[in-house]
Amino acid sequence: MLTPEQIESRLDKILLRVQKPGRYVGGELNSVQKDWDFIQTKVALVFPDIYDIGVSNVGLKILYDQVNQREDALAERAYAPWFDMEALMRAHGIPLYALESKRPLACFDLIGFSLPYETLYTNALNILDLAGIPARSIDRDETHPIIIAGGHSTMNPEPMYAFMDAFVIGEGEDVIHDIINAIQSFKIKRQDAGNAIFHLSSFDARMELLHTLAQIHGVYVPRFYEASYLQDGTVSHIEPTVQDIPRIVTKRLVAVMPPPPTKFIVPNIDIVHNRVSIEIMRGCTRGCRFCHAGMITRPVRERSVDEILLAAEEAIKNTGFEELALLSLSSSDYSNVLELVTRVGEKFGGTHLKVSLPSLRIESVSIDLMEKLRANRAGGFTLAPEAATERMRRIINKYISDEDIINTTREIYARGWTTIKLYFMIGHPSETLEDVQAIANLCKRVISEGRKVAGMKVKLNAGVSTFVPKSQTPFQWVSCDTPEKIRAKQALLRRELCDKNIKLSLTDAEDSFLEAWLSRGDRRLADVVYTAWKNGAKFDAWHEGRAYEKWIAAFEEHGLDPLFYTHRQRRTDEVFPWEHITAAVRKNFLFQDFRQSLEGQIRVDCRLNCFACGILPTFANMRRENPGDVWKCPDVKSPVSLNPSAMSSLKLLIVGD
């Protein structure tokens, strides 16, 4: 295995031959370098995309901070090299290394992947290969690190089950310490005194450690579970194959968010989000039926204004960044948003700091908030109506009137903003071409009304993505729209939105289908992922890496029909591939909510009325130990039970039929 000095020597010969050498050199301000020889547990945190994207990832920043606070552990980082760098690394025999120490990833005790979305899967396999680590868990032995993954996409971990030793289900701040402690205890148990190298003595020893990890709340070790299938290809059941592990793995939750990191790494190059990012609250109470993040991050927990301000001040001092992003799934729903924005203005007034609140809900953006944001040099306004007819907004449970949208955008333009971003989705359940035409009509009307108050300079950026049904949501039963219908809807929008002041952005339909295959896929897709990667698929979210035909060929090679995963009606009593994984939102609740969507019924903000989704009973002890209003939950109402026969007989609406 190469030493750090040997790796640096080889890097010197190739770095000037690649785009952006700064991606690969490390040494950034606020990066943490510890004395390797005196640290008990070494963790490599990996974001399987390029440095420019990964270094901004908030989840990885949190874990980097958490691990490096320990005196007995270190965390270093690695990202996916771009095509040019990978080719040179392979040609010169350079394994993938951690930026801080330049040590090969294979030297670490634990490698943790962040997998927020499915299109990173082939990159994860490529990174393991570049590190000289077998891609499949079953092929690893006592000389290899433990490989884990977490992130939103792992709420259905099954398409990646063959490659990860373990998955973290849910939030990572506490469980990362449990995992490190378990590894340390195991090392003490297995090693001779004075041997500081993590070296498992046998395959059985590795299995013993994985069995220990499987007993940690929120850790899923897939090799200890077995899936069976019915003749129609659907899942029959998923059961544990060993004792003392849970039949259903429930997500890990932190009762109170720990203090946010304040020593953000200052990158060597310009990146996507060069800013201080402070998470002001976690979770969402709105219950949008398509929203994966909103369902799996319940309940809402908020940080205090004082804690946010203190962290922001420290982070700006430590980095020199000139933008502050106040992050959440719906920042304008933060209970004290006006006070927060006011006090940010008071504290940083007169500086060059720009404040942004990404992800604002139209119905919670008040005129007062607009005024405060304008006074604080806020960035552009981004709003997400998601659909353009009131019928569709009722179906997705994002109900707001057209007039509210127009009035809000008019007020924004009137206060000096010249550009607004609106996000929509196409392909929602029961959507028609008339609903898509309404998106174009609404965009035109926003521009028209904006010109009345701000003149011809107003602009609109309309981002239109394609709906992908996700696990653990009310829409996990629905099928995707067909490729033909998606392309017809996109063509309609291109024809209609040709105003020079309207910028239309559309997602590639093929990218959406790749995401859809993997988001609700079963274990059989692991072979498809592996074959697609071996055939050259990687950077699947990038135009340069798009390899749709390689995925289709991989499906064919393994005798699987991609339409089975995307364009098939799910039975109401179907066992899902993720049935043994839960975000603590009950399946019955999700089905009831789905049934209400078919009837156009809406649910109000669950801070106003608890609908008994299952979160509070699951974490009752945690809530009891943390009283107060940190959790924004009302009293629980009696849960609604559904008759199984009624579930089986209900006719589902099939999108695309």
Protein language model features and the residues they cover:
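Short secondary-structure boundary/capping segments
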Residues: 60, 92, 128, 162-167, ...
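N-terminal pre-triad scaffold of radical SAM enzymes
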Residues: 45-49, 67, 265-292, 316, ...
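N-terminal [4Fe-4S]-dependent radical SAM core
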Residues: 12-44, 51-52, 222, 228-277, ...
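Glycine-rich beta-alpha loop elements in corrinoid/cobalamin-binding modules
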Residues: 80-190, 199-240, 474-522, 530-545
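Conserved SAM/AdoMet-binding glycine-rich loop
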Residues: 45-46, 119, 314-421, 425-465, ...
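Canonical Radical SAM [4Fe-4S] cluster-binding loop centered on the CxxxCxxC motif
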Residues: 57, 270-306, 612-626
